[in-house]
Design a protein with these regions (language model features):
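Divalent metal-dependent phosphate-bond-processing catalytic cores, especially two-metal-ion Mg2+/Mn2+ enzymes
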Residues: 10-13, 31-32, 36-126
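Acidic/histidine metal-binding catalytic segments
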Residues: 12-24
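An active-site-proximal "capping" alpha-helix that borders the catalytic cofactor pocket
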Residues: 1-12
């Protein structure tokens, strides 16, 4: 997360850098991060400070939704994906779980369609 962000900033790709952070933090805090913090304290502070000030837009939310339904074998049911993450990391914060379900609902309302139909869940295989 921080390496991608810093690298994209160094190249002048601020919007891409933003996505490097926001895709992992649909709740703008590190408190519900799932995974291991393999960053220095300085990098962690940079992530936290940036998350406090970043303004997320529809593109950020769309990338977050895609991240919450993507698996190595294709598109997964969002709850199956979250359960897979829970099994691998031992926990999945309810706040993040609920936020992912809200993202799904948000884009289903925007498109007027089931999100799995939109992304071709039953037909797309990598």
């Amino acid at each position: 997360v921080s390496d991608g962000y810093s690298y994209m900033i160094s190249l002048g790709y601020d919007e891409v850098a933003k996505i490097c952070l926001t895709h992992s933090f649909n709740i703008q805090t590190t408190d519900v991060y799932i995974g291991n913090f393999d960053t220095t304290q300085e990098e962690l502070k940079m992530i936290q400070d940036t998350l406090e000030t970043v303004v997320m837009d529809e593109y950020d939310r769309l990338i977050q939704l895609c991240d919450s339904i993507a698996g190595p074998e294709g598109v997964l049911d969002i709850e199956d994906r979250m359960n897979d993450v829970r099994q691998r990391y031992g926990a999945y914060p309810k706040e993040k779980w609920d936020s992912n379900l809200e993202l799904k609902k948000h884009f289903e309302e925007k498109t007027g369609k089931n999100i799995y139909t939109v992304v071709g869940k039953d037909v797309f295989k990598p």
